[in-house]
């Protein structure tokens, strides 16, 4: 089964205890609109299993992470991001990770800049 943490907001969203504006959901992952969008399209993709950050990923999580990566293009297509998009992970304090549950930001519908912040 998927391990969840009762005090984690993303676990609560993944379990449906807190409502979200869902884009995609299956038994492994959830994608929902960010509450503070930084682009015309800004969604978060999370595993339902609680993994704190990329630093906490183990060998047994590799299939799940690969699965998330295969779903990105489907989610992007659903959102009309045919001109491209950016996938971001913030890890740790310096990476500005604010929620301690692994998540990927998918941003699109505007020209991105480089380097990122």
Feature-to-residue mapping (PLM):
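HIT superfamily nucleotide-processing domains
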Residues: 1-117
């Amino acid at each position: 089964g998927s391990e969840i943490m009762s005090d984690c907001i993303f676990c609560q969203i993944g379990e449906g205890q807190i409502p979200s504006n869902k884009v995609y959901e299956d038994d492994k992952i959830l994608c929902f609109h960010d509450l503070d969008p930084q682009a015309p399209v800004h969604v978060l993709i999370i595993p339902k299993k609680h993994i704190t950050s990329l630093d906490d990923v183990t060998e047994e999580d590799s299939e799940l992470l690969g699965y998330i990566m295969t779903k990105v293009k489907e989610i992007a297509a659903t959102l009309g991001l045919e001109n491209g998009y950016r996938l971001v992970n913030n890890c740790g304090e310096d990476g500005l990770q604010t929620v301690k549950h692994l998540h990927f930001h998918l941003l699109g519908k505007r020209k991105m800049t480089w380097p990122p912040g």
